[in-house]
């Protein structure tokens, strides 16, 4: 039994998935969006809603949550169907349509599928400390939901990548004490962020703890009191008073059922034709970070472009007898779906 009938099933409700709703709507195609998370926004909302983004056209700075809100508002005229908290498990191909079945038994009939699942299902990489679970979601967090939660607190950031560096810069504005623990003296972040960190280190806004790694967490009832860190060169140990610990060691990606769909995968990404975003399977497309091709640049902006290309190609599947006459949105306006 079919529960929903639509033109396109979009797998993933992150920024690229939401923008796909808008792009398909501009071509008079309807979408049903499936996501394993219980809210719209993907990693942008789940992991870093207040993280500033600087490379969205026309926005000198915008938070991840604001970007999602704007994309949702932009796509509202096309009345998408969101199936949240569900995972697309199976795809069945028929002559004139596809069936997508979720882990909840929901069945959606569509004419094409666009996979916009980012890195797939994801989870944070935990610190290798025995009792870390006791503190998680109480005083150990893998994302920042509200910067104000850390106002006038003693905070430790662990990690040396972009997320650790970016949040160190932002949280230095509100914390009472900020430690940055890393195994190396160099950080893997953008040159601009690196310059900001150097300035904050010199001004004492951030206490740099290198080359150290976290050895032990001390506290009770989920409340962190102290963190013991160990120098990886000299074995010297330091005990630092900390209210909150933010480990940023990346996330582990899991493509889940996608691996069983007969789609060509390379390095946990879906191989596509860069001109159309088609996969090797008929009527199945992939856009955003989950897709790959020679010269691929992993940017939200790139995903937006891929979404537009995929939707324009799918138009010929949905409307095989109607030629697509390209029009700019200024002259076309918002069509009714």
Swiss-Prot record:
Binds 1 FAD per subunit. It catalyses: 2 reduced [2Fe-2S]-[ferredoxin] + NADP(+) + H(+) = 2 oxidized [2Fe-2S]-[ferredoxin] + NADPH. Its EC number is 1.18.1.2. Keywords: FAD, Flavoprotein, NADP, Oxidoreductase. It is an enzyme of class 1 (oxidoreductase). PANTHER family: THIOREDOXIN REDUCTASE 1-RELATED-RELATED. This is Ferredoxin--NADP reductase.
């Amino acid at each position: 039994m079919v529960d929903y009938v639509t033109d396109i099933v979009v797998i993933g409700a992150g920024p690229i998935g939401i923008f796909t709703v808008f792009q398909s709507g501009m071509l008079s195609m309807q979408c049903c969006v499936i996501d394993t998370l219980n809210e719209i926004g993907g990693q942008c909302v789940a992991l870093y809603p207040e993280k500033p983004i600087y490379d969205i056209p026309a926005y000198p700075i915008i938070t991840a949550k604001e970007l999602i809100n704007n994309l949702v508002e932009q796509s509202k005229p096309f009345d998408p169907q969101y199936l949240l908290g569900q995972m697309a498990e199976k795809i069945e191909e028929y002559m004139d349509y596809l069936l997508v079945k979720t882990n909840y038994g929901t069945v959606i009939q569509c004419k094409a599928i666009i996979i916009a699942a980012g890195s797939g299902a994801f989870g944070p990489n935990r610190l290798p400390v025995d009792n870390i679970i006791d503190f998680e979601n109480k005083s150990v967090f893998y994302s920042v939901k509200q910067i104000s939660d850390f106002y006038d607190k003693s905070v430790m950031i662990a990690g040396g990548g972009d997320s650790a560096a970016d949040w160190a810069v932002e949280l230095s504005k509100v914390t009472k004490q900020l430690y940055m623990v890393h195994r190396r003296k160099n950080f893997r972040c953008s040159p601009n962020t690196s310059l900001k960190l150097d300035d904050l280190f010199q001004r004492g806004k951030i206490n740099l703890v290198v080359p150290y790694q976290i050895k032990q967490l001390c506290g009770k009832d989920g409340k962190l009191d102290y963190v013991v860190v160990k120098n990886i060169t000299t074995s010297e140990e330091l005990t630092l008073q900390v209210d909150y610990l933010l480990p940023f060691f990346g996330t582990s990606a899991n493509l889940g059922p996608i691996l069983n769909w007969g789609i060509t995968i390379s390095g946990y990404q879906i191989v596509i034709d860069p001109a159309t975003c088609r996969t090797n399977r008929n009527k199945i497309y992939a856009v955003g970070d989950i897709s790959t091709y020679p010269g691929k640049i992993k940017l939200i902006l790139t995903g937006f472009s891929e979404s537009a290309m995929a939707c324009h190609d799918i138009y010929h599947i949905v409307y095989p007898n109607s030629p697509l006459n390209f029009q700019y949105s200024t002259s076309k306006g918002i069509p009714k779906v």
